[in-house]
UniProtKB/Swiss-Prot annotation:
Keywords: Developmental protein, DNA-binding, Homeobox, Nucleus, Transcription, Transcription regulation. It comes from Gorilla gorilla gorilla (Western lowland gorilla). GO terms for molecular function: DNA-binding transcription activator activity, RNA polymerase II-specific; DNA-binding transcription factor activity, RNA polymerase II-specific; RNA polymerase II cis-regulatory region sequence-specific DNA binding. The keyword Nucleus applies. This is Homeobox protein Hox-B7. Residues 137-196 bind DNA. Sequence-specific transcription factor which is part of a developmental regulatory system that provides cells with specific positional identities on the anterior-posterior axis. Residues 193-217 are annotated as: Disordered. One of its GO terms (biological process) is embryonic skeletal system morphogenesis. One of its GO terms (cellular component) is nuclear body.
Amino acid sequence: MSSLYYANALFSKYPASSSVFATGAFPEQTSCAFASNPQRQGYGAGSGASFAASMQGLYPGGGGMAGQSAAGVYAAGYGLEPSSFNMHCAPFEQNLSGVCPGDSAKAAGAKEQRDSDLAAESNFRIYPWMRSSGTDRKRGRQTYTRYQTLELEKEFHYNRYLTRRRRIEIAHALCLTERQIKIWFQNRRMKWKKENKTAGPGTTAQDRAEAEEEEEE
């Protein structure tokens, strides 16, 4: 009896609390009815209307805001239009449409092929026995500059045959090798002999003696 008395006294102390919520705001439903209510199963037009009615019952002065949509509420609060919510998606979609997936795949394949070729070249080693050292190997023709040709012509004018010491000096002065100097003088002597075929046999013997002396040195 004492507990029931205190409970009745407690509930009777707040008689106006039931008038805070409207009668139709939160209708009492059984557990089965709550599960089978189609308005509770989704966010349809009926659920929005009941929610707006309940909001009007709770906040009489805020009925205008309860009837607005979520985009309208955010637009009114931040000064944005509803169409601005999807603006960030447009450039991204345009970029995706402009990129061809086949190009990226081809670029990736070409890069992998190039990397594999470079790795193979770096691992490949050429040994001396792999290089051709026979007479069939062609040598590139040496080209002389105008200054080098002029100096060689001057030297040939005074000496058609060079000693080894003089050949080394000319090679260092003209930035050439001894072999290049020797080949140039041989070719120049052949040209000079063709130009002077009418020379006597004494001159030929003298040239042969000078050539033998050059080979010995």
